């Protein structure tokens, strides 16, 4: 009779710690997700004209408009720039295949990556909100429940898209190419380069149907007093379900 070999207690926690150390040593994705968004927030906050309300921006200031956009940017950058790379590299190097011969399943590496990067996202969001409130006089989020729901769905949508890219890309170089082709257009429709409120009708409609556009819209509503639009939540949930299914079907461990 063959004995079943189980992973030692605490093995998953050790994998999470290892992935966290690797993320700290190779912080490019974390810098993109945390550093760039924080730098842009400070830059916008230091421009006095950006703190004056505008009728063209639905009565909000430019700074207030960009806070939720930068939160969406942070989520997208970590999920799309940092998540696929290590997973594709592990597959290229045969690490995932070798783990299948150990008591710890290869899926634990994937789960550990998600834990580390979810923590990085939450840290980034807290930093952006705290800095905006403490140093630039932004009001605290009005609808905390709606904000949490919007953040959870945004993270789920972007994680599943990132995992699908990791599933499709055969090499780390191919993953970077796909990411560049996906991330920057998504950030355009989220309003990073041009405020969504000023987009013409067709582009505005497209924006609301993209994951980061829907995320930014849901965040705007929840931060400034309302519940996120149902359409935005459904769009994010739809991306999570569709790309979650694709990632599961397409992901290869070797």
Label each region the model flagged.
Residues 2-18, 192-233:
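Short hydrophobic, aromatic-rich alpha-helical segments embedded in or entering the lipid bilayer
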Residues 4-11, 15-93, 113-121, 125, ...:
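Transmembrane helix-boundary elements of multi-pass transport/secretion proteins
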Residues 19, 42, 129-134, 163-164, ...:
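Alpha-helical transmembrane segments of multipass membrane proteins
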Residues 31-32, 107-111, 178:
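Signature of the 12-TM Major Facilitator Superfamily
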Residues 42-50, 166-209:
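Transmembrane helix segments
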Residues 45-49, 89, 98, 133, ...:
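Transmembrane helix-loop junction
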Residues 98-107, 211:
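Short helix-to-coil transition segments within interhelical loops
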Residues 106-107, 140, 172:
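Alpha-helix N-cap/start motif
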């Amino acid at each position: 009779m063959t004995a079943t070999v189980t992973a030692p207690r605490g093995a998953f926690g050790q994998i999470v710690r290892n992935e966290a150390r690797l993320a700290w040593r190779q912080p490019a994705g974390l810098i993109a997700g945390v550093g760039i968004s924080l730098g842009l927030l400070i830059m916008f906050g230091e421009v006095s004209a950006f703190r004056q309300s505008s009728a063209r921006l639905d009565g909000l200031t430019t700074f207030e408009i960009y806070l939720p956009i930068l939160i969406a940017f942070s989520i997208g950058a970590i999920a799309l720039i940092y998540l696929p790379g290590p997973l594709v590299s592990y597959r290229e190097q045969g690490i995932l295949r070798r783990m299948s011969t150990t008591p710890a399943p290869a899926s634990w590496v994937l789960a550990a990556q998600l834990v580390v990067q979810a923590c990085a996202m939450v840290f980034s969001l807290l930093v952006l909100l705290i800095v905006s409130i403490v140093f630039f006089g932004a009001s605290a989020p009005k609808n905390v429940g709606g904000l949490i729901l919007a953040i959870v769905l945004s993270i789920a949508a972007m994680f599943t898209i990132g995992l699908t890219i990791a599933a499709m890309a055969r090499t780390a170089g191919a993953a970077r190419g796909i990411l560049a082709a996906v991330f920057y257009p998504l950030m355009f429709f989220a309003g990073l380069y041009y405020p969504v409120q000023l987009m013409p009708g067709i582009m505005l409609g497209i924006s609301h149907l993209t994951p980061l556009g829907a995320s930014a819209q849901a965040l705007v509503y929840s931060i400034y007093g309302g519940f996120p639009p149902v359409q935005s939540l459904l769009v994010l949930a739809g991306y999570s379900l569709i790309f979650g299914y694709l990632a599961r079907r397409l992901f290869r461990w070797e």
